[in-house]
Amino acid sequence: MARFLIVEARFYDHLNDMLVAGARAALEAEGHEAEVLTVPGALEVPGAIAMAAENGEFDGFVAIGVVIRGETYHFEIVAGESARGILALTMDGIAIGNGILTTENEEQALERADPARKDKGGEAAKAAIALLKLQDRFGA
């Protein structure tokens, strides 16, 4: 059994609830424990994971959030930089599943967040589990 921290950027409550539920269900189905930490936005997710990874309390992480395109360039910055930050941490050997949705509209986000549909929260948790298994295999 491993301990996972689900780090959520809580902005769209109803969508986050679904993503977290999917992630938690996927982790618990494999016998893992999950705790949830909320941060203000998607740009804060990588930093929160980096801080939490420092103490070794958690074996893996699931990043959760929803970024919906608006009328400004802000979408590109938030979507790209949050993904870049998560990827950088993953390249440093931290097991992270990225479940931060980047969509054109709320309808697309709902389709992806709903555990009964595309279940991207569950998929992100499964990715984190897979990376944790790779850590074990390669002794990372």
From Swiss-Prot:
Q: According to its UniProt record, which residues of this chain constitute the active site? A: H74
* Disulfide feature: none
Catalytically driven reaction(s): (2S)-2-hydroxy-3-oxobutyl phosphate + 5-amino-6-(D-ribitylamino)uracil = 6,7-dimethyl-8-(1-D-ribityl)lumazine + phosphate + 2 H2O + H(+)
Q: What GO biological process terms are annotated to this protein in UniProt?
A: riboflavin biosynthetic process
Sequence positions that bind 5-amino-6-(D-ribitylamino)uracil = F11, A42, L43, E44, V66, V67, I68, N98
NCBIfam families cross-referenced by the UniProt entry: lumazine-synth
According to UniProt, the name of this protein is 6,7-dimethyl-8-ribityllumazine synthase
Query: What gene is it encoded by?
Result: ribH
